[in-house]
Amino acid sequence: MYKRQQLTKLFDFQVQEPTFSPDGKMIAFAKDNNLFIYTIATKAIQQITTDGKKNAIINGITDWVYEEEFAFVKAFDWSADSKKVAYIRFDESEVPEFSMSMFNTGLYPTIETFKYPKAGEKNAITSLHIYDIAASATKKVNLDKYNDFYIARMQWTNDANVLSAQVLNRHQDNLDLLFIDGNSAAAKVVLNEKDKAYVDVTDNLTFLKDNSFIWTSEKDGFNHIYLYDKNGNLKNQVTSGNWEVTSYYGFDEKSNTVFYQSTENGSINRAVYSIALSGKNKKALSNEVGTNAATFSPNFQYYINTFSSTTQATRYTLNLSLIHI
């Protein structure tokens, strides 16, 4: 059976990164380097920023450096209660420009000029802001202690009044995880990560219901999974050993289980495992030696295992993870 529903075109203009609020009543989007909120019931548009300008100010969408180096474009996020929107602002006014010829349908090429910092040149100046929808007011997060830095990740936690941000120095060997009060915009460092070479920025940060969080780190010489409380105190190391966690698949809160891929059965092999958040009851979900990779269903009950080896072409199998049986 199916239900037929009507699709409604909301805008007669192009928008970037339209994102529903958690309560489904609003849509945040970017247009012309500014941020807006569309209320579905009233069809009203509320403008969050007004200073957006090409090759000068970008609000809520990343610049070239962030898109290429940190692999994300949408630089805004809804709070869990749909009352606030946090966003990153990029001031690229002082960034050097690069021009290139664009060969379109015309007889002659046109010139496109955009901001492009090369090594050693000025990056965009970034700042973090929290917009309160009911008050139509914005607060800037004080990051004055940092100099020439990146806001490599930004997301609200499960607590609707706590925003997280990962601030990375330009050398990329020192990262602070910040928790920011949604009302005052006051920030505190809850975790620091240093590395002699560089700190790898990932999307592995996972918040639990009590706002404790899962974090991956190479601090013991190997990439492993850790559990911290909501204040950034280490509760326990989930995985350990002289091997690498090569992919973190996620956490199932119902079964209190973490899923990951690692090199536990040999550095040239990849196997898929589940483990309790306590670090106990580890199980191998893949049973063939070679390269295994998993894609899990949203509830982690099923997964597609992709397997290959020197003697086996890529093979896909649908499996039960057995965690809810």
Please report, for each region that a protein language model flagged, where it lies by residue.
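Conserved small/polar residues in nucleotide/adenosyl-binding loops
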Residues: 1-5, 323-325
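Asp-box/WD-like beta-propeller blade repeats and closely related beta-sheet repeat scaffolds
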Residues: 4-26, 33-34, 44-73
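Short loop/turn segments that connect beta-strands within beta-propeller blades
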Residues: 40-43, 133-136, 182-183, 229-231, ...
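A short loop-to-beta-strand structural motif that recurs across blades of beta-propeller domains
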Residues: 34-36, 127-129, 176-178, 224-226, ...
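Beta-strand C-termini and the immediately following turn/loop, strongest in propeller blades
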Residues: 27-34, 39, 74-77, 86-92, ...
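Non-catalytic accessory segments flanking enzyme active sites
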Residues: 13-16, 86-90, 95-98, 125-127, ...
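Beta-propeller fold detector
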Residues: 6-8, 45-53, 139-142, 187-192, ...
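Predominantly five- to eight-bladed beta-propeller fold
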Residues: 48-76, 84-140, 322
